[in-house]
Amino acid sequence: MAAAAQRLLAASTKIVGVGRNFVAHAKELGNPVPKEPVLFLKPTSSFLHAGVAGAAIEVPEPVESLHHEVELAVVISQRARDVPEASAMDFVGGYALALDMTARELQSAAKSAGLPWTLGKAQDTFTPISAVIPKSDVANPDDLELWLKVDDELRQKGSTSDMIFKIPSLISYISSIMTLMEGDVILTGTPEGVGPVRPGQKIKAGITGLIDVEFDVQKRKRSFST
């Protein structure tokens, strides 16, 4: 079971992000609380797998405000299209701890111009992710404590119990719009406390009692615009 869960990420075709899925986080950024899920896409090339020697979150020039967002990732086990909420959990193969790294000034500029968030969300190393936790190892995904520290300072701590849209609702909604494939990842949103990280700092994050990860932050050697 564990080996099968680890193989899922290798098959992933896309990462579906869910924005503003915690009331406190929506409010801390001055956003309204959504009435339906706010979705965005990230490419699988943005994955940064925990435990890989030398792997680090890269801050590209000229980004000055790269923010951390700790999230529960849901990993899909099989093709899912128009899935009803009642059977949505049958399509979950496992979970992971993920970070939705966000170049905040690029995202804010895109939002102001009415443009997609791609530059702020989709760059290489912007989705650090843990190993997959088999579904059978998670008794209640609606009651998991997420936490994140920067240089041992606690920045984020929250529970998936505070998510506005729960996992079955997200799977049903997303699969009504696009087909979810085996290995696809849903980032379910972040609790409050997001903030910037700088090159030279270290991020530690985890799901209490299940898994923890750490990533170094370094400056990318080239600007994303050259």
From Swiss-Prot:
For this UniProt entry, the molecular function terms from Gene Ontology, in alphabetical order, are: acetylpyruvate hydrolase activity; acylpyruvate hydrolase activity; metal ion binding; oxaloacetate tautomerase activity
Requisite cofactors: Mg(2+); Mn(2+)
According to its record, what are the GO cellular component terms? mitochondrion
* Keyword Isomerase on entry: yes
Which keywords appear in this protein's UniProt record, sorted alphabetically? Isomerase, Magnesium, Metal-binding, Mitochondrion, Transit peptide
The free-text note explaining how the cofactor binds reads: Requires a divalent metal cation for activity.
Entry binding sites for Mg(2+): 69, 71, 100
Q: Which subcellular locations apply to this protein?
A: Mitochondrion
| Transit peptide residue numbers | 1-30
- The EC number on file is 5.3.2.2
Main localization of the protein?
Answer: mitochondrion
Pfam families given for it? FAA_hydrolase
Q: What is the purpose of this protein?
A: Tautomerase that converts enol-oxaloacetate, a strong inhibitor of succinate dehydrogenase, to the physiological keto form of oxaloacetate.
Question: Into which family does the record put it?
Answer: Belongs to the FAH family.
Protein's name in the database: Oxaloacetate tautomerase FAHD2, mitochondrial
Give the species: Oryza sativa subsp. japonica (Rice)
Lineage of source species: Eukaryota, Viridiplantae, Streptophyta, Embryophyta, Tracheophyta
Encoded by which gene? FAHD2
